[in-house]
């Protein structure tokens, strides 16, 4: 059994899936509908504004976009689905966040926020352990409630090996 993980845009992943370069495609984005693919997993994934424990904004019942605009942010790169959603929320109010750091690794961003380096906007599955441990606080930002979809696809004509079926079952949990 060989497991190779690749990162790519949704379009690139679906093209690779369609040309049989990959067996499965896992996305975190807006809902995707592809008639030539089987949708094996389709789950909601909340995206959260998080701050280090003890941050002044964490004490507030609600945080406005104007308050966020004045904060130091560590974000994923432009073009990432949830980063784009944050930028759109801000732009709708005539605001923008200019992050002092952009990284491709959401896990590393989470760790940096835990160490007090700024705020971030990350999927709940990335931050859930830190929230439970009390090292991060989730900010309540009513003007920017974002939910993406975790989706796993395979080609409709693809024969699924036992290992692929086991992986799909693992992701479904």
Residue ranges and their predicted role:
Residues 1-5, 91-100:
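A local structural motif
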Residues 37-48, 133-146:
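Short beta-strand->loop
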Residues 36-73, 162:
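Flexible hinge/capping segments at coil-to-helix
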Residues 26-36, 84, 88, 92, ...:
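A ligand-binding cleft/hinge motif common to bilobed small-molecule-binding domains
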Residues 1-34, 103:
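Central regulatory/effector-binding core of bacterial HTH transcription factors
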Residues 28, 57, 72-93, 160-164, ...:
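Secondary-structure junction motif
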Residues 137-173:
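A late-sequence structural motif
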Residues 16-18, 68, 111-117, 152:
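Hydrophobic residues within well-ordered alpha-helices
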């Amino acid at each position: 059994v060989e497991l190779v993980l690749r990162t790519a845009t949704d379009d690139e992943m679906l093209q690779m899936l369609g040309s049989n370069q990959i067996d499965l495609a896992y996305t975190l984005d807006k809902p995707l509908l592809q008639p030539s693919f089987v949708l094996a997993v389709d789950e909601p994934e909340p995206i959260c504004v998080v701050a280090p424990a003890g941050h002044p904004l964490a004490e507030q019942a609600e945080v406005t976009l104007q308050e966020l605009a004045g904060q130091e942010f560590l974000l994923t790169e432009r073009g990432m689905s949830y980063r784009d959603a944050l930028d759109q929320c801000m732009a709708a109010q005539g605001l923008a966040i200019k992050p002092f750091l952009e990284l491709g690794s959401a896990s590393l961003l989470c760790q940096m926020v835990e160490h007090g380096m700024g705020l971030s906007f990350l999927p709940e599955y990335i931050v859930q352990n830190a929230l439970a441990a009390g090292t991060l606080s989730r900010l309540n930002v009513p003007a920017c409630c974002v939910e993406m979809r975790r989706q796993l696809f395979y080609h409709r004509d693809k024969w699924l090996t036992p290992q692929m079926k086991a992986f799909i079952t693992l992701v479904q949990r």
